């Protein structure tokens, strides 16, 4: 009884020693994720992505990505692989059962006249079971579980990132389309102005300078179109790659037709952010795997006790084979004798590996809060910027209308009209970019809060 108590005490100390040396992460959560935003349990990340991105064409692209993206399929296969490996480790708890049989025929006194023949027949079942006194198998199983969960959470994080990447590329593509429409329409206006300037010059109404100015404006606008078309095609190829398809034309809406699904900033509680972000959960499981690896290294310093059981039949001929049962049991104790500190060094190294992983986990948490704060700043700024750009565009349009009227009345020169046209073109493009940035800021906020991987 005393020996049993001593053994149990040693086992308990083994587990405590590992947990004592594997220090918990130093994480102190703030009262609010963002100081300027009141803490609330409601969070935009809890909304399914299909309710955020309501455009059917964008939804189709996201669904294709979730079904066909090669990185996501690779991650899924990896999760399934680790699930199978976990079953292998779990099987170490069970006894290993085997079977063997043989027929042995020996001839003795080969050079003599009285040769003898010996026949031996056997059929046996074997059973080997390791008694996990010091938790070696238990720690190995914990490591396998943690690695599996780490990969599963990593798959969720990848899905979250891919949804954000597809949506971002989609809005960038729509913004490029809109910019191309603006410039194409401006080019038509420049062509009309060039025709009018040519007629005035040829009719002797003006000098050649206004005509040349009109040509410069037309050419400087026309040269923008090929560059935009190139950007559009490259962006389409980028989206096709994300969806797991060959380069193709991407069906999309017009950016001015799109409406945000939300108009309030709901960012939730700090504690919920830790739970919601799959990349943080993945880092946590990675930390647990390192602890389990340290526990395994600790258990490796102690003896392994294996019980071997063998039973069956063995005889010198077939006639009495089933009347000759055979059984025996062996308890095998294997222990390191002289390792010259190798196992202790391996355990110490595993502890240091845990510490390094702990610092990475703490960094991941800090990074998550930083990303949310940056996303909130960007979202607020982008909304204000879009409002200001709308006002700027309206003012530039009014300026252009007045300049055209005054030029017709001979009150200002043609160069003043050109200046007003440039201001309006720039204002239109800047507004288009501001609307794009507003949508992208929402996507980044949604992603930083951990939205996108949740199932309906």
For the regions a language model picked out, list residue spans one by one:
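Amphipathic alpha-helical coiled-coil segments and their boundaries
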Residues: 68, 75, 130, 137, ...
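Short segments within alpha-helical structural elements
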Residues: 191, 220-248, 382, 390-449
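Bacterial Sec-pathway N-terminal export signals of envelope proteins
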Residues: 16-85, 258-286, 336-337
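Small/polar (Gly/Ser/Thr/Ala-rich) solvent-exposed segments
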Residues: 73, 93-117, 128-157, 177-179, ...
């Amino acid at each position: 009884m005393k020996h049993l108590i001593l053994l149990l005490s040693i086992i308990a100390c083994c587990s405590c020693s590992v947990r004592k040396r594997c220090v918990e992460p130093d994480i102190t959560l703030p009262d609010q994720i963002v100081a300027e935003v009141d803490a609330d349990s409601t969070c935009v990340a809890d909304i399914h992505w299909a309710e955020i991105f309501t455009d059917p064409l964008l939804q189709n692209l996201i669904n294709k990505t979730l079904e066909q993206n090669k990185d996501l399929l690779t991650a899924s296969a990896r999760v399934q692989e680790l699930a199978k490996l976990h079953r292998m480790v779990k099987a170490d708890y069970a006894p290993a059962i085997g079977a063997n049989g043989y027929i042995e025929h020996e001839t003795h006194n080969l050079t003599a006249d009285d040769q003898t023949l010996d026949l031996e027949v056997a059929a046996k079942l074997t059973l080997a079971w390791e008694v996990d006194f010091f938790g070696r198998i238990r720690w190995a199983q914990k490591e396998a579980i943690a690695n599996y969960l780490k990969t599963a959470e990593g798959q969720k994080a990848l899905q979250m990132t891919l949804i954000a990447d597809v949506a971002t590329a989609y809005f960038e593509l729509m913004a490029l389309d809109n910019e191309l429409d603006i410039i194409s329409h401006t080019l038509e206006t420049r062509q009309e102005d060039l025709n009018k300037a040519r007629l005035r010059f040829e009719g002797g109404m003006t000098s050649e300078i206004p005509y040349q100015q009109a040509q410069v404006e037309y050419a400087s606008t026309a040269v923008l179109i090929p560059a935009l078309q190139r950007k559009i095609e490259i962006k389409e190829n980028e989206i096709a790659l994300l969806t797991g398809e060959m380069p193709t034309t991407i069906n999309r809406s017009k950016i001015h037709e799109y409406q945000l699904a939300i108009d309030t900033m709901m960012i939730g509680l700090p504690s919920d952010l830790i739970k919601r972000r799959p990349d943080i959960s993945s880092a946590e499981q990675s930390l647990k795997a390192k602890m389990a690896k340290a526990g395994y290294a600790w258990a490796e310093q102690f003896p392994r006790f294996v019980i071997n059981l063998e039973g069956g039949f063995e005889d010198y001929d077939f006639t009495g084979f089933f009347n000759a049962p055979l059984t025996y049991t062996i308890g095998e104790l294997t222990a390191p004798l002289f390792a010259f500190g190798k196992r202790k060094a391996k355990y110490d190294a595993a502890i240091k590996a845990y510490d390094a992983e702990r610092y990475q986990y703490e960094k991941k948490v800090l990074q998550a809060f930083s990303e949310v704060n940056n996303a909130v700043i960007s979202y607020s700024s982008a909304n204000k910027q879009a409002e200001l750009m709308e006002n700027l565009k309206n003012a530039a349009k009014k300026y252009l209308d007045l300049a055209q009227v005054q030029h017709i009345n001979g009150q200002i020169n043609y160069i003043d009209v050109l200046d007003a046209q440039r201001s309006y073109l720039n204002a239109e493009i800047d507004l288009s970019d501001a609307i794009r940035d507003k949508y992208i800021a929402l996507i980044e906020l949604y992603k930083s809060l951990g939205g996108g991987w949740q199932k309906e």
